[in-house]
Structures are given as structure tokens and as C-alpha cells.
Amino acid sequence: MRRVTILGAGLAGCEAALQLAARGIAVTLIEAKPEKIEPAVYRQDGPAELVCSNSLKSESNATPSYQLKAECRIAGSFLLGAAEAAKVAAGESLAVDRDTFSREVAALLAAERGITLAANTVVGSLDDLRERFPADLHIVATGPLTSPGLLASLSADNHYFYDAIAPIVSAEGLDMTRLFWADRYEKGQPDFLNCPLARQEYERFVDALLAADKLPYADHERPQFFDRCMPIETMAERGRDTLSFGPFRPVGFEVEGKRPYAVVQLRAENAEKSAFNLVGCQTRMRHHAQREVFRLLPGLENAEFLRFGSVHRNAYINAPELLADGLNLLKHPDTYVAGQLSGVEGYNESIWSGLYTALAILARFDGKELPPPPAATMSGGLLRKLRAPAGRFAPVNANFSIIDNPTRLRKRDRKLFHVADGIRQFGEWWHGLEKVTQAT
């Protein structure tokens, strides 16, 4: 029986393990969280932990995230099925209860007889991985906090960016008389809790934010952020109105017939709505400063923090220089790299990466090469970005600029067309794979 060892039980590692095992491949799945768990980053012992937001992004049928999820669903993504089972109300977005999601994934892994789960193990290098866990092929899916030794054994030319996390507060400390339930433009159900700010309240918040005590970055490193992970104070430093035109934009909301100057949204962390994530409020402020600054928001004066915001350094490899078309290493072709370590950014992108890597391995075991998905698909776009050198490689996520589908339709119609046509072409590609797609 063919055997694959997967280092890392995050989104990519779990998806790859389930895809391979469903097709008769013996899998050893090794948890690989850092030996010293950072409580500000990791909170769970289980697999597939969602570290940052609890949202898998929009389910609107004119968005790149919808298209990528649709493609993964066509290919039978196990983790998106788990997400549906753990879903919480979040307007047009697919958001999950983190703990329920992890338990759902753990149940899928436990139910699959072809998967052997290994306890949390620190692996120092690729040679260490091969010696301790021999297999036909290996997948490294250790995520953005990969150990320095393992990272160095992959390549000396690795990149990084900083990722910021937003705080989570308890519902018990919120003054609901000052907040209101609504979704922007009244789309769907009123699933978000909203905190409206008048101009004076907004200015006071920005003043405190800019003056707050913040954690320093690592010595001799220039702070580089992926746009969606930028700390709120960094945005405010770019201009006092940046937040009111960004994460705090008030468009689509009215309070007593008037649009507020700014609106802070809170997204439920679970079905009971006992905890809320402060949307867009990722931060590197010290804990005491977070209490002081966020309690200036109307309705949050007595907020109880269940998790403080934080910043951590994410490492990723220079994929265009290091990876082959199947997402295996050019210098170590029996080793594949999946998930955020490979250079994709986002939950859905990590799930896709694990799924695609599994398909590439299945094709290889069958003596074939996996044909690339069509250029109009998000899968094809992500793959091309991971393979095409274009100056300094930056993490890639699902967006319309990575697909090839020209049309002269109006903007809204064009997006709908791109998504529908990309999903159609992916379906045709998928059904043409024949044996690779067949689960036992």
C-alpha cells in the first residue's frame, strides 16, 4: 500500500489527508504546532485550528471566495463540509464556530481507517522527517509558524510577513442598548452586532489608538503585512479617516434615519452568540492598551476580553523558485509543500492547496501528471501565481486579477459571468480527471 506522511494538521494537512485516505492511500498525519505554544496564536489542541478570523469569507455568487469554495466543493472538499456543519450566522459570509469546526474535522479524521494520527512532534529538518516517518511521499504543511530548522532545510531563500489578530470579547460585557443588529445594506439576516460612532467618538478613538502602547517588531526586520492582516493602528497612521473609509465604513447603515460617522462590526464566534470578534480590529497594542482603547467604543465600556489581539510572524517559501507544477520541491521531488507555507494566503486557499496537492499525488501514484485547471478558474489562477516568477513573490489569495476570463460586460455582470463560467470550466476539468477523482 502506498503511504504518505503529512507534517501539519492544519487546514491543508487535514484536507490532503482525508482526500488521500478516501482513495486508499495510507496516511500518517502529524500535528506540528510549535513546541512552545503561543497562547495568543494557538488556543486549541485539536486539528484545523482557525487562528485569525472565524470567517471563510463571502458566499455571494459574484465574489472570488465564492468561486474558490464552489470549485473545492465540486472536488469534494471534506473541510468545507465540516464548515457547513459548524456554521454560525454571519450574513453573506460563511463563518464557523472554531471549536465545533475543529471537532468536526477531528471526527472525520478519526472515522477514516487509512489515517494514523501522530502526537504533536517537533521535526527539525526534512532529513529528520524522512528518517523518523518514512513514506513514499511527504507533505510539509506546517503553516506560517514553521520551525526555523525545518524552514532552512526547505530553502535558504524564504520570505515572511506579519499577521495581526483581532480581539474577541464576551457578550456579557456588552451594553446592548447602545448596539444594534444589522447586516450591511440590510442584506440577508441581521447577523452582525454593530457599534455606531459619532464624529467626536471616532476622533477620540483614533487619538487613543495612535497614542497607545504597542509591541515592537523583531530587530532588523521591516514590518510587512498582507493587506487584510494589517493592524488597525497601522491603518490609522496612514490617515485619520482611513478607518472610516475602511473597516469602520458606515455605508449601508442607518441609525434613526441617519448614517453614523463610522461603524464597528462585531461578528459572532458561536451559535449561542456568547462571544464576538471585533471585525477589522487586528492589533499589536499591548493588552492593557487594548482594554483602554477598545473600551472607548460605545457599548464596549465594560468589555470582557476572551482573547486579546496580537501579531505574529508568518514564514513562507519562494514558491516560484522552489516548487514544480505539482507543488513538490524541485530539489526534493518526493516532498510537497501545502498551505500557507507554500505561499497561499487565506483559509479557503489553504484548503484548496491541501486538496490540489492530494490530487497531484494521486495522479503521480497512477503514473500520470495532473493537468492544470483552466485559466478561468480560481484553482488555475492560484496555481499559476505559485509557479510564475514576477519579482519578489508575495502571498497569493483568490481574486479576479489571477484569472484569465476577458469580457466587456458591465462590472457586476462581469463578476457574475467570471464566477459562473469559472465554476463551469472547473466542473468540466474535474469530471475529466476520471480515476483521480474516484474515492473508494
Question: How would you describe each model-predicted region?
Answer:
Residues 19-25, 29-81, 375-379, 383:
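N-terminal FAD cofactor-binding segment of flavoenzymes
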Residues 112-267, 276-287, 291:
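Predominantly flavin-linked oxidoreductase catalytic cores and closely associated redox partners
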Residues 4-27:
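N-terminal Rossmann-like FAD-binding beta1-loop-alpha1 element of flavoenzymes
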Residues 278-344, 351-353, 371-388, 393-399, ...:
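A glycine-rich dinucleotide-binding beta-alpha-beta segment and adjacent secondary-structure elements
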Residues 98-117:
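Helical element adjacent to the flavin cofactor pocket in flavoenzyme catalytic cores
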Residues 7, 138-141, 337:
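Redox-cofactor binding/interface segments in oxidoreductases and associated redox assembly factors
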Residues 351-371:
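Internal hydrophobic alpha-helix adjacent to the cofactor/substrate pocket in enzyme cavities
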Residues 393-440:
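C-terminal auxiliary extensions adjacent to catalytic cores
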